[in-house]
Amino acid sequence: MATYATPLAGLEGNVIYGKDGSVWVNFLLEGINVNPYNPSKVSSVQAITDDLFTSLSAIDSSDFLILGIKSQIRPEDIMAQCAAGLPGLQDGAYADLVTQLNVFFRKIKSGELASFERLYWLSVAMPVGLTTTEKILGKMVITDPHDGISIKSVRAFNASVMKAIPEKFHARPTTPQHVRWVFDRARLRGLEVPFAPKTPAKGEKPDKAAMKFGANSFPQVNIDQAADTAALTEKFIEDLADRLNERGAKALKSGKSSAVSSFLNNFRSLTSSRMLAIRNLETNNADFPDGYTSHQVMMGIASPPTRTSTAVNSFTYIVDQAIGCDADFALRITFDASAVSKETASKALRDMKSEDLANSRDELDVEDYADDMNNVRELHATVKAESNPIGMKVAALFAFAHPDMDYLKRRAATLSKTFGNAGFTTYQAVGGQHDMWMQMLPGVTRSRLTDDLMMTTTSYLFSGCMPLRKTVIGDSKGVPVAINTENALGQIILWDVLNATDKGNASITVCGAQGAGKSYLIKLLLGYMLDLNRYVYLIDQHKHGEYEVFATTLSDSFVFDVTGRQASLDPLKLYPSEDGTAAQVFMDLWLPLLNIAIDSPEAVALSRMLKHEFRNARKLHSTRALIDYIRRNPVDVSESLSGKFAFWGEQTFCSALIDPVDHGEVINLPPLDAQSHCVVFRTHNLAVYRGNNIAEAEPSERYAAVMYNAIARAAAYRFSQIKGACAFFGDELHFLDGNDRVLDRLIRTPDRTGRKDGNFIVGGSQLASDFGSQYDMIKRKFILRQETHPNAVEALEWADMPATEYLVSRMLEETSPPDPDDNNMPTRGREGEGWFNDGSGNIARIKVLQHLRADRGRMADTTSSRMIRAEELVR
């Protein structure tokens, strides 16, 4: 074992004691959730971050470190989140789901669905007031550098820091094991991402054995501070050997060390490097004698952009983006009111003017000095605009890592350019890489190099960069549906099905062009509903039975062709008679279809005949029986009623409401099976009238409107009898436009009034404009790829996102982009890309997960050349 990056005197709880006499208290913080598509949310995060810096400025310390450290989320923790939303899982309540969750777990373990988070380590130096001599003596172990520091004073300082951190950052003290973890992260950066030690939950007693960790119990590493120089030298020797004859090459090989020394003596600047090679000696093997090597490039920010607003997504947040390499960042902070004073600004301007007069050789030099002076003036103007500015100096350090040194060089150049395009000036310290690496570790005192990189700002101004941030969406428990791709951390987005309505409206809309993955996602949600033994009614009006095909993978489903003589939605069969429900639904469905006014004699006569006592005594338990009774028992309006009913009773497409007659025999269809967990209503043989004058509608079109009303009634009644989540699914219901009453019953009513019963709807459409007023209260929205500018604008606005040209372009060109080498199908691996508004004020870019069952993935595929049609199913 070896020592830490800097010699330690001890580790106790969350306190680091350095041999140089320094004392550091340490806490882990969580980032504030940011919706990057909502300016008001961004402003809120800025205010919260400003509260943190303002509180820290009151602490008696001159050295603060905030380290943004990447941590891998344990697969077990992700599965625990899933299980938390699935009560009864361990007892075998969801047999169909267990196999899928095992597949999901294996994908996480393999790294395919690995998920990460960015934690923030706050380290604050306690003022101890040691002289330089005392610090040196402490390192030489001649004296105890902490002799004059009492445990009581350390505890008091520790408590003051904890109290200063706003609750929204969920601060928790670190442990000695966390120091080992942060060191592991620093040495393994680019090779692997270690799991953070588990922190005891609130009120839970810590494991004392796990808390013990020696100050000299760290893994042994060898740090090559001139990694790129070594590689360059090696390349030179190889090239030289190729140019020599066999004898010369052999001599060069035997005298390699002297050749290297000669090469370095001729090029003395090569002794300083721009890259580190951290060799993890404890992982050595035959292939890697020095152990696995992490190559790291350290960068500092020498100057910020002139307009700091450009820094929001290209500053510290860059480490969470898909930048092609591993990365962390650190902020070394000191608070200094004089740094933003008028006197300091005036002195800076005077110094710059003097330097300008003394050093400028041409107009370009004059321009550079003028730009610097303008920056000072702009900062001073910003400070004056703040009511109570908190002056602070910040040094921003970045570590980029990868196993391949040559690749990392190229990435570092690209990243430096990325910073430059955002207005930042980067500093890749030649010969100072190790110093910068050390500065990104807690317990290490700020160095002169870091002091040189300090930028002057105010707490409010710097908070606008949102250095402590995260973007997470979805529910905190439940089944996995998508990956958060707003950054490269790979958060798994969960859907809490069983408690979906606890937070309010739980309905969902999915919008996407053909081939964007809309129906694939809807079927993913549908599958989970059935896996969790919940109830779903859905309409499938696709002529080839898209959802009928998928229903073959569901455990308890019933496909009901409403024109196919399979079952009955006859209100007199389906609803209870005693409380008047059957009569009410019957009248609501049939009066409009029969063109009977509610104040007509026919309506009154029907009302009397529909009473429970009347029907029960005469055994009128179906509409067909009622029609026959009216025909056989003439009253004043019998002839009129018989004539109106007779037409519909003869139509074959009306079998779901009136029992059909075959060769004079009534076929008594059974009522719709109320026990099925999923009912797929096949309505492909019914066309709906979309005009404004119902009198012009064809008979089948008029009946279709009544049938959809009957389906809505059946769903509402069935769901009202069930405790727990139930949902109505409707894909591409825009064909009902103009039939507001039908849409109200199918969409608006269950969406707005079903929350207390746990009911919600899931609706899909290719175009956002097809979501009418019935969908206005729905907050959870998925939007996938669109193919035209107007459609993209509508989709973004529907999801409560700004339809900027950048987002429209990203929607059209960078969302599941077509692959020209694959017949313009979505690029493999990028299917199902889009955005998700989770209804809680959070929006992020996402990628829909694949079905965890291969058969469901196959049956969900609607690509025209691969789609399985209902008529192809083996019956």
Sequence positions of predicted segments:
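Extended, folded cores of ATP/NTP-driven motor/assembly subunits in large transport
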Residues: 1-448
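Conserved catalytic alpha/beta cores of large enzymes that bind or transform nucleotide phosphates
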Residues: 515-604
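Phosphate-binding P-loop/Walker A region and its immediate neighborhood
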Residues: 290, 421-507, 512, 518-529, ...
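Conserved P-loop NTPase motor cores
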Residues: 491-516, 521-527, 537-546, 558-563, ...
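Conserved P-loop NTPase motor module
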Residues: 612-717, 782, 816-875
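The Walker A/P-loop phosphate-binding site
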Residues: 2-20, 25, 279, 286-287, ...
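The start of beta-strands in P-loop NTPase/AAA+ ATPase cores
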Residues: 23, 118-120, 535, 677, ...
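Helical/strand "switch-coupling" subdomains that flank nucleotide/phosphate-binding cores, especially
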Residues: 82-83, 96-149, 153, 388, ...
